[in-house]
Amino acid sequence: MSDSDSENKQTTTTATSVTQRLLLSLKEAAKIIGTKGTKIQKVRDDNNVKIGISERKERCSDRILICTGSIEDVSNAIGDICEILLSEDVVTNDEDSNEKENDEYNSIEDEKFVYPFLNFRLAKPTLDEVNDAETLKKIINIRVLVTRAQCSAIIGTKGDRIKSLIENRGVRMIASNQTLPDSDERLLEIQGTSMAITKVLEDINAVISNEVRATREKRYVPHVRRRNQPVSTNTSSNTGSSKSFDEEFKSIVKIPEAYVGAIVGRQGNRIANLRKYSKTKIVIEKRASEVSDDAERIFEIISNDIKNVELAESMLKKNLETEIQRRKEMEETESA
């Protein structure tokens, strides 16, 4: 990136005003507000942003956090919100919530909701995947509300932009295909550390600011659905299953070029068996005409069931680890 590009990006992140909207559960909202509003006020003061949470509606299980300011300030504020949600302290005497105070505030991420849009689709990674217990504790999921136009800009042509954001910032992301009830907004779920989420939000908001014009798309407002209105087209929303017939879940695994052949197997048999067992589609990036063994190829896993995607991802990584260990042992044997 040139000096002028860096200066332009810095100017954009500091000068352009943006508004970020997050979907929250009641418990998340109460935890962010804090005792007598002290926590959300600190976020407001520390980051020089306008931030608030929508009123709690009777018989509604969700609320909206709205944050406005410069791209940098808003992104940092959302990072602070992530830190609040990760904290283990319990909300007490919250004047904005009638919920009974208890330790359930400490297990927000494990809660299952009747309202399907509140249920996270990205499962928390395992210790084997992260390889660091402290980092694992710092990983969190958030639900960002985006319009159709914004979502298209974030995904990019053939998904190139969202892939780049995932790779460059070390996060996982899923954009839902369906809109929230009575609106034109969709959910962009982001998983990562607070710092990684802050950085990717800077990138996302810069894209939206530079490429998406103001539209009249209808924003989502928490409300009680009409009696005959379906909750969701996701047939598994009340069963705890992750399967959705109108959503597509994706994940990317990078495999060093030197190991691609072993992972794919002779005549593609090994990867074919993995596809069949995990019930996923696995798209392998084409090999460049000239590439070194330390280069990486992208294996993109696709399914309408997030559990299948996670299974395939885990199996791919395990196969890679096994092959690396096998070659290491062969080298030690030969050198002995």
From Swiss-Prot:
Domain KH positions: 17-81, 139-204, 248-316
UniProt keyword list: Chromatin regulator, Chromosome, Cytoplasm, mRNA transport, Nucleus, Repeat, RNA-binding, Telomere, Translation regulation, Transport
Similarity comment: family membership: Belongs to the HEK2 family.
SMART domains: KH
UniProt GO cellular component terms: chromosome, telomeric region; nucleus; P-body
Subcellular compartments: Cytoplasm; Cytoplasm, P-body; Nucleus; Chromosome, Telomere
Isomerase is among the record's keywords: no
Function: RNA-binding protein involved in the correct localization of transcripts in the cell. RNA localization is a widespread mechanism for achieving localized protein synthesis. Involved in structural and functional organization of telomeric chromatin and regulates silencing at the HMR locus.
Entries under SUPFAM superfamilies matching the protein: Eukaryotic type KH-domain (KH-domain type I)
The protein's name in its UniProt record: Heterogeneous nuclear rnp K-like protein 2
Main localization category: cytoplasm
Gene Ontology MF term list: RNA binding
InterPro entries tied to this protein: KH_dom (IPR004087), KH_dom_type_1 (IPR004088), KH_dom_type_1_sf (IPR036612)
